[in-house]
Amino acid sequence: MTDQPILMFDSGVGGLTVLREARVLMPDRRFVYVADDAAFPFGAWEEPALRTHILDLFVKLLDRFAPAISVIACNTASTLVIDALRERFPGHPFVGTVPAVKPAAERTRSGLVSVLATPGTVKRQYTRDLISKWAQKCHVRLVGSDRLAGLAEVYMREGFVDEEAVRAEIAPCFMEHEGLRTDIVVLACTHYPFLVNRMRKTAPWPVDWIDPAEAIARRALSLLPPVDGALPQGEPDIAVFTSGKTDFAIGRLMQGFGLSVR
């Protein structure tokens, strides 16, 4: 079915950064955005419980929406459960979100790179394996932030954020060594690009902030079968919140992203 939607999954509103890029690349496609806000933040969960929760949830999501592809627009979930999802649902394509270590290693001039992520992503062996594979010649600092995802949620809902709190969370990313400075910070959580302007403002010096959203969207596009002619016009793009609870601010935010809350 060519009118099958693309499913975007995150713990909250962070995956909207990926949706935004996907819409540019796939303007004729229909999207279903699923925010598992009942389980937010994923980083607070024990790994086995979170893995089971997401696998069980996807049984329901795939049955309800029958998507053409599912994008796990969350680093914490992807590094934990993407392989298990592919094993559990072998006939369905999944696109994961992993820290953009390879492009960071290719771009850095100083060799000092920081990966800004949730504590869950920082502690995963998956993340360390990426560094070992792609950034052996770099000094990579893993920085786990307990607060940034929540600050991004507040910012997107309310339109303001405590800049001093942002400054404190990003401060460990900035290293100086033998006259060299950190020149790349990988945003390894899809929530973080919403705060990148505040990060630039509060950073001690300019760096290149790597947002993987476009690369994720391009990967999803590459896995979709080609379409002959125009796609049929069907249901509108929708947003689903697993808590079943949305307020005016969330409704307005989703509307701004062209999503109807269901």
Swiss-Prot record:
Annotated family: Belongs to the aspartate/glutamate racemases family.
A biological-process GO annotation: peptidoglycan biosynthetic process
Enzyme class: isomerase
The UniProt record lists the keyword Isomerase: yes
Catalytically driven reaction(s): L-glutamate = D-glutamate
PANTHER family with a match to the protein in the record: GLUTAMATE RACEMASE
Pathway(s) of this molecule: Cell wall biogenesis; peptidoglycan biosynthesis
InterPro entries, per database record: Asp/Glu/hydantoin_racemase, Asp/Glu_race, Asp/Glu_racemase_AS_1, Asp/Glu_racemase_AS_2, Glu_race
Residues the record marks as active site: C74 (proton donor/acceptor), C189 (proton donor/acceptor)
Signal peptide: none
Enzyme Commission number(s) from the entry: 5.1.1.3
Pfam families reported for this sequence: Asp_Glu_race
Name of the featured protein: Glutamate racemase
Cystine pairs: none
GO-annotated molecular function: glutamate racemase activity
Residues binding substrate, per UniProt: D10, S11, F42, G43, N75, T76, T190, H191
Keywords from the UniProt entry: Cell shape, Cell wall biogenesis/degradation, Isomerase, Peptidoglycan synthesis
Tagged with keyword Flavoprotein: no
Role this protein plays: Provides the (R)-glutamate required for cell wall biosynthesis.
Coiled-coil intervals: none
